[in-house]
Amino acid sequence: MATTRKDLRGRTLRKGEMQRSSDKRYAYSYTDPLGRRKYIYANDLVTLREKEARFTKDQMDGLDIYVAGKATVNFVFDRYMSLKTNLRQTTRSNYLYMYDRFIRDTFGKKKIAEIRYSDVLQFYNYLLDKQGLQTNTLESVHTLLHPTFQLAVRDEIVRKNPTDGVMAEIKKSSEQTTGVRHALTIPQQRAFMEHIANHPVFCHWWPLFTVLLGTGCRIGEALGLRWDDLDYERRTISINHSLVYYPVGESRNSVLHISKPKTEAGVRTIPMFDTVKDAFEMLHEEQKESGWNDVEIDGMSGFIFCNRFGNVPNPQSVNRAIKRIIADYNAGEEVEAKKQHREAVLLPDFSAHHLRHTFCTRLCEKETNLKVIQSVMGHKDIQTTMDIYAEATEEKKQESFERLAATLDIF
């Protein structure tokens, strides 16, 4: 039988109420729609219960506002998230981070029933033009707004989902001139790696980028690799977990965690090419001399990659390094091109994920078996593999046509 909680004066406390022994303040705890524990504080019990009553009324008023169609996008998004009880913690944290950063303080304050297709299109263009988002980041924003509006449709708050078709329009009308296409070209790939290998500051990044370009691993999969995941005899690498970096708690400070692959396709064994093996052996010798990486994350240890502080790098730090390397290379290339009176061959802006796509493109250029490519890449949906294959082979076909046009004289 549950015991009745009482305060220091012996008065019976209601569910959720408590009195702290440290400062004798009263508190009422509740869980918000996002599953986070919240507290209401007061110096005395009477004041606390007045605050509880106001809080309960506000909750009911919020429901009335929703039913009346006067709710904001923020209100419906929070409601949507409260219903997604099966989300993994990493996914939930990423959703909240993206929403809070790009939507909550602007578009999120609009009344959802008053938003039209053109409003969404205008907001997306604002994110692209004024906030500098790339299309893939905008797609992440879209994956939050579309189901939010879809919930409002199902609850009959709005008749149609105004986000339908917006991303298709964005992709059709806005040809991105900045940034990189999905994969680096072979000359770009070589320029990037040669610059790293010959640079006195960036050379320590060579093994990691060699592994990324030589395996097609996701950045979290690569950073999470342990020595036990390598089989030198069979020349294979086991991909069975991933390193994730996401905010937790009220402070929203980010920490490293180990995450299992979302799908069965993510668990796979991939080949270890000679250059990748060389990169691993280089790191093995370095740790053998300087000391093994003893960092433990969620019970796992023996990680291959570590930074100068002895910690496992997080994905954001890798992407920041890529930006520094690109800036350094491009600055030097512009100087050299000017000296040699030629046009500079610059590296485009890209992230670690583009290196995975680059590997997949190189693989598609050599391998015709889509099932093999899908298995190596860990694609859940073969359509993803087919899209990359189509892009890679189309470029090869165009190159062949250009060579043919230069050598074949039929007139």
Which residues make up each language-model segment?
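N-terminal core-binding DNA-recognition domain of tyrosine site-specific recombinases/integrases
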Residues: Y39-L45, G69, M81-P162, P200-C203, ...
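N-terminal DNA-binding module of tyrosine recombinases/phage integrases
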Residues: M18-S118, E285-M300, E394
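Basic, Lys/Arg- and aromatic-enriched nucleic-acid-binding interface segment
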Residues: T135, E139-T143, R154, V158, ...
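C-terminal catalytic core of Y-nucleophile DNA break-rejoin enzymes
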Residues: K38, D44, T236-S238, P247-V248, ...
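C-terminal secondary-structure termini that scaffold catalytic or DNA-interacting sites
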Residues: T3, R234, Y245-V267, D274-V276, ...
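Short, basic (Lys/Arg/His-rich) helix/loop patches that form interaction surfaces
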Residues: E194-W205, I270, E286-V295, M300-V312, ...
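Short, Arg/Lys-rich segments that mark the N-terminal edge of DNA/RNA- and chromatin-recognition modules
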Residues: M1-N43, F202, N240-V248
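Catalytic-site neighborhood detector that most strongly recognizes the C-terminal catalytic loop/helix
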Residues: L243-Y245, T358, M377-R403
